[in-house]
């Protein structure tokens, strides 16, 4: 069948989203409907051959097209996180719906149990593939008033006194929108990153890469931040290491975000989080936090699916081979406290 890739149906960003699981299943009942929608996301302006840029193709199977001009065969999943998957696309779509429609997301065990995946490792790998798709490399920088600070994820390791190497320093930048009439703090978007060591100059580089020049950056009194005033930023330091007021008063944004992050991570992911994969958990929190005010449940589904099409594949074996053994020193212990993640906002 000769096609020009004029796709119809399915959710359209900002226009229409599935409101319930029943609507989701009605739109995507089988692999053919899923593949057609992936093609629509991959080629929003119509099919373009990756070799010769021709705009006409023969559809040779549910997921494959053959260019009329040069004869190149193209799969709609090639180069995406679905590349060479042996699982049905409808199962992938169900996984994305499950992850995005739940307020606090899903753990690998949730995914494994609810979708009947072959193994826990498969569910774990799928989640990490999707987390890699949650952050766009070209995303906009934070603007206006931005508070920058660091916190720690983890608890005290068994048998250790004082500080613990199991705690990972996390860098936080968040837009402070102000306060409402009831004095409730209003926050904008957030950016998170894992630091190599606490209190390092890496936090200054983090501010440079996440905040738009010309914005006002608020930090603690560490001298390393003062260079920002000479690099196109307005800089205001509100506390020092011996400041009379605690950080949650002078820099309330990062402290509120850190509190929510710890509760979300502990409430949703009850297993140990490997330090080398922590950034991807932070990316998932960022994805959810920055869309927390959306009233359309399906909007997150649409955005993650859209970004999955534009994310390079990460083969299952690559993810598993890099996964550390359980109960090693690199793991981060999370206390099992209840999650009520975004209700304050």
Q: What are the residue ranges of the model-derived segments?
A:
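Residue-level recognition of single "structural anchor" positions
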Residues: 1-345
């Amino acid at each position: 069948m000769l096609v020009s890739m004029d796709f119809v149906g399915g959710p359209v960003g900002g226009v229409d989203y599935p409101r319930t699981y029943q609507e989701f299943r009605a739109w995507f009942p089988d692999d053919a409907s899923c593949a057609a929608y992936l093609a629509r996301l991959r080629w929003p302006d119509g099919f373009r051959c990756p070799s010769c840029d021709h705009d006409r193709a023969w559809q040779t199977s549910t997921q494959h097209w053959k260019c009329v001009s040069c004869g190149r065969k193209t799969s709609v999943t090639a180069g995406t996180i679905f590349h060479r998957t042996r699982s049905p696309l409808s199962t992938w779509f169900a996984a994305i719906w499950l992850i995005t429609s739940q307020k606090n997301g899903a753990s690998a065990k949730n995914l494994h149990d609810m979708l009947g995946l072959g193994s826990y490792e498969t569910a774990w790998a799928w989640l990490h593939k999707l987390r890699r798709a949650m952050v766009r490399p070209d995303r906009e920088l934070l603007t206006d008033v931005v508070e920058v600070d660091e916190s720690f994820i983890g608890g005290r390791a068994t048998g250790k006194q004082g500080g613990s190497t199991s705690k990972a320093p996390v860098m936080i930048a968040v837009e402070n929108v102000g306060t409402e009439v009831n004095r409730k703090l209003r926050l904008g978007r957030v950016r998170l990153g894992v630091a190599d060591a606490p209190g390092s100059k890496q936090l200054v580089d983090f501010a440079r890469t996440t905040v738009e020049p010309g914005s006002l950056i608020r930090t603690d009194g560490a001298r390393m931040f003062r260079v920002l005033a000479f690099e196109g930023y307005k800089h205001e330091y509100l506390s020092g290491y011996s400041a009379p007021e605690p950080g949650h008063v002078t820099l309330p944004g990062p402290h509120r975000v850190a509190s929510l992050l710890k509760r979300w991570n502990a409430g949703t992911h009850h297993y140990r989080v490997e330090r080398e994969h922590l950034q991807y958990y932070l990316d998932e929190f960022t994805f959810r936090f920055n869309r927390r005010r959306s009233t359309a449940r399906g909007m997150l589904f649409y955005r993650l699916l859209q970004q999955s099409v534009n994310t390079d594949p990460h083969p299952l074996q690559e993810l598993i081979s890099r996964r550390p053994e359980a109960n090693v020193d690199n793991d981060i212990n999370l206390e099992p406290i209840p999650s009520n993640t975004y209700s304050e906002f």
